[in-house]
A protein has these predicted regions:
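N-terminal hydrophobic targeting/anchoring segments and the immediately downstream early-domain regions
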Residues: 16-188
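Sec-dependent N-terminal signal peptides
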Residues: 4-13
Length: 190
């Protein structure tokens, strides 16, 4: 009988234990090691061209989605800076305004990598360039275009965007345009 009471008492003590899980330090260290030895990237970083000036830019710890101090602190290797243009009118004036917006964003990204942060970040257009830049301790900027609207009716603009470093382009973004319908259903009430 004493054995049964002993077993029941032991079970009761087990049930009364603090059930908070203690973090497995070795597991956290392993995760951190993986993070530090793997190429980490953020595939969508919106930008504001007002944050790409001599006095205010992404080499500073700004209240932005990403910047160099945040990339360093979070061990982020690659930021895909986005050349986004909201959908406007499908007119010559609309295309001109959109093209100016897109060009301003391309220019801002190039100022970051060529002037303000040239010793800390560089533009990559291939995975080999990403690897090479990581090996020398630089952060990496890549460029994506959200909304093909700014290229207007001149498909040759795609090649120019490519030459400026863009490596992907979505056809539409939050609105129908000259290339594609979007999910917003402006014309078909869907």
């Amino acid at each position: 009988m004493k054995t049964i009471y002993g077993v029941l008492f032991a079970l009761l003590l087990i049930q009364c234990q603090d059930t908070k899980q203690v973090p497995d330090v070795s597991l956290l260290q392993k995760a951190q090691l993986i993070h530090l030895t793997t190429t980490t990237l953020d595939t969508h970083d919106d930008i504001n061209v007002k944050n790409f000036t001599d006095s205010l830019n992404y080499t500073q710890n700004l209240d932005t989605q990403v910047n160099l101090p945040k990339m360093q602190a979070g061990a982020l290797d690659v930021a895909w800076f986005i050349v986004y243009t909201g959908q406007g009118e499908l007119t010559p004036e609309g295309y001109k305004k959109a093209a100016e917006n897109a060009q301003a964003k391309f220019d801002a990204i190039h100022r970051l990598v060529e002037v303000y942060g040239k010793n800390k970040i560089a533009l990559a257009t291939t995975s080999k360039e990403v690897d090479s830049l990581r090996k020398i301790g630089k952060k990496v900027a890549m460029i994506g275009v959200e909304n093909a609207f700014p290229i207007g009716e001149n498909i040759e603009e795609v090649a120019r965007y490519y030459a400026m470093g863009a490596r992907y382009m979505s056809l539409a973004h939050n609105g129908h345009n000259q290339f594609s319908d979007s999910n917003t259903g402006e014309f078909d009430n869907t």
